[in-house]
Regions:
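Single-residue signature of alpha-solenoid repeat helices
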Residues: 108, 142, 175-176, 210, ...
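Hydrophobic/aromatic-rich core segments of domains that either
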Residues: 16-86
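TPR alpha-solenoid repeat register
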Residues: 125, 159, 193, 227, ...
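Short coil turns that delineate tetratricopeptide repeat
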Residues: 120, 154, 188-189, 222, ...
Length: 263
């Protein structure tokens, strides 16, 4: 209701509104979740995971996607249909994460509780619950939540990163090393982690390192034009104009292909 009245919405509220309006119009509509996206917020050595969702609408044999942030979200895989209950759970999970990022753990707690009640097997929800407990001064509960997340999803990078930070901060070097190795195995296969590392290198002026990470990202996934745009910028900073132009040509080709797929 607020999103409709103010004409302002994030991806979740926009999707909830779209699905509700489609149902009112007699259309088959559902939420869709995108995995493996660049949608983490890092702060104070803590990782909050934000999921991206959009709306799917079925009209006869046609399947349409309505996405408020299609141009901004990076994802390798197509969206996955989810239930209305899971969609609402994601709303509460993301709202809790937003409040945590704004340093409001007391306000985040009821949203987190509802999210976990609606989706008790959602690993990233438990990882975010761990952040909440840590903000509330309960590292033992945070550890339990992170481990619960990993029991549900052994490759959950957010839970792994937060566990590594937790053990580092409390001086448990043995456990820190165990989970750091697990995290490294996950990250080395993640093109978007490599992309974020490249962006960080570029911001610091370490353009040779940025090139290495952009190229690793591309080896893992060759379908995102933004990898090539970043690579071109880094090459230009190094004075390698021929390589930069080649990267930009590839970025342009991928952008045209993506635009053609949406039309």
């Amino acid at each position: 209701e607020q999103a409709y009245r103010t004409r302002k919405a994030n991806c979740l509220t926009f999707t909830l509104l779209t699905v509700a309006l489609a149902h009112e119009s007699g259309l088959q509509a559902y939420g869709q979740e995108l995995d493996d996206i660049v949608a983490w917020r890092v702060g104070d050595d803590i990782v909050y995971r934000f999921n991206h969702v959009n709306a799917g609408i079925a009209i006869g044999r046609s399947r349409l996607t309505v996405d408020v942030a299609q141009e901004l979200v990076m994802s390798r895989d197509p969206p996955r249909p989810i239930s209305d209950q899971q969609l609402v759970a994601l709303y509460y999970n993301n709202r809790a994460a937003e409040l945590l990022a704004g340093a409001s753990p007391a306000a985040a707690a009821p949203y987190m509780a509802i999210a976990l009640q609606l989706a008790p097997r959602y690993a990233s929800g438990w990882a975010n619950a761990g952040v909440l407990h840590l903000r509330q001064g309960d590292p033992r509960a945070a550890e339990r939540d992170y481990l619960k997340a990993l029991a549900l999803d052994p490759a959950n990078a957010g839970a792994l990163m937060n566990l590594v930070a937790l053990y580092r901060n409390n001086g448990d070097e043995a456990r820190r090393a165990i989970y750091a190795r697990r995290l490294e195995k996950v990250q080395v296969k993640d093109p978007y982690f490599q992309f974020l590392q490249a962006e960080d290198n570029a911001r610091q002026g370490a353009f040779a390192g940025a090139v290495q990470h952009y190229r690793r990202a591309i080896r893992l996934y060759d379908g995102d034009s933004r990898f090539y745009v970043g690579l071109a910028r880094a090459y230009r900073q190094l004075g390698e104009e021929r390589h930069a132009q080649r990267a930009m040509n590839r970025a342009a080709a991928l952008s045209r292909r993506s635009a053609g797929g949406r039309n």
